[in-house]
Amino acid sequence: FNPCPYSDDTVKMIVLTRENKKYDFYTLDTIKNHNEFKDTITLKPHVFITHGFTSSATAENFVVMAKALLDKGNYLVILTDWRMAACTNEIAGLKLAYYPYAASNTRLVGNYIATVTKMLVQKYNVPMANIRLIGHSLGAHISGFAGKKVQELGLGKYPEIIGLDPAGPSFKSNDCSQRICETDANYVQIIHTSNRLGTERTLGTVDFYMNNGYNQPGCGLPIIGETCSHTRAVKYFTECIKHECCLIGVPKSKNPQPVSKCTRNECVCVGLNAKTYPKTGSFYVPVESKAPYCNNKGKII
């Protein structure tokens, strides 16, 4: 018995470009009908965005993130909608009990994204270097599983996977093969915002601990504000798409240096350009309680 069964038919994709911002659902079979795929080549950088438990591709946070990407650059954004396998349509009071079922579907959804990637590379000549994955919560692990699968398929690695507060329950004590991991892409960027729904464990090439990785400012009391802290990862990253070098991470230590002393050589900016900075490892990121959450007073490093 799985109340939230997975099949390839239950996963849909919303494909957005600057020219076509319609929220239509596509499948592996119908994606060829999208204007962007009428030709056999597409040169745009591609970004997959994948939601988490009991969410969907049309949830406001992901709609806002997709818009920020299209405002920023000439991207092709694919919002992966796996809501049925994520237990989104289940009875509210029972949803939490269904979490293990949604968690067990993550590898299958990751394999699906890898299959779409294979089609993009082989049928539409999209270079792997042009495909980046962003996932929130369970969607972060899905992105990691996609990263493992494309390597198995002989496609090489994605240039980057961005894990927004990867889900802790069912995953935090797993080894690399059973969760998002730094070997899943050439660069794996992790943003930690909740130590209960997420995990404090380092998982990536860079791990950003926003406000120490828990109890995000503006989210209210600990525990009660846990969902707010968990989803804040999506909002932080969206602001970092809009405002370059908005949130600066300082190397994690007992006495982190102030952001004002940062230089490009030892600190790293959260966001799409993080991988252009030389430093890797764990970083502490102070944040404000309201958007755009910036900690840099306009400083760009």
From Swiss-Prot:
One of its GO terms (biological process) is killing of cells of another organism. The keyword Acetylation does not apply. It is found in: Secreted. PROSITE patterns: LIPASE_SER (PS00120). This is Phospholipase A1. Gene3D superfamilies: alpha/beta hydrolase. It comes from the Eukaryota. Keywords: Allergen, Cytolysis, Disulfide bond, Hemolysis, Hydrolase, Lipid degradation, Lipid metabolism, Secreted. GO terms for cellular component: extracellular space. It catalyses: a 1,2-diacyl-sn-glycero-3-phosphocholine + H2O = a 2-acyl-sn-glycero-3-phosphocholine + a fatty acid + H(+). Its EC number is 3.1.1.32. Belongs to the AB hydrolase superfamily. Lipase family. GO terms for molecular function: phospholipase A1 activity. Catalyzes the hydrolysis of phosphatidylcholine with phospholipase A1 activity. May act as an allergen and induce hemolytic activity.
